[in-house]
Amino acid sequence: MQIHERHRPVDFLEVSARLQPHGPVRHNDFVLKFWPQPYEMTLFPDGRAIIKGTTDTAVARSLYARYVGS
């Protein structure tokens, strides 16, 4: 499920530090991956995200808001 809630750049260092307590996080200059079980979230610098583990838009948006912010 692709989500694009933010329309501003994402600071991977700041988001990564905030996500560490919630599950494994990896990132480079192009992508941040986060695994809040049972989901997998891939975040891009422009704010887009791909959330695996659900086909429900409401769940995907809720996960995005919870972990990335709106």
Question: Language-model segments: which ranges?
Answer:
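Short Lys/Arg-enriched alpha/beta "domain-start" segment
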Residues: 1-23
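Generic recognition of long tandem-repeat/solenoid scaffolds
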Residues: 1-5, 30-35, 51
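Generic C-terminus detector
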Residues: 37-70
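Intrinsic, low-complexity N-terminal interaction/targeting segments
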Residues: 20-34
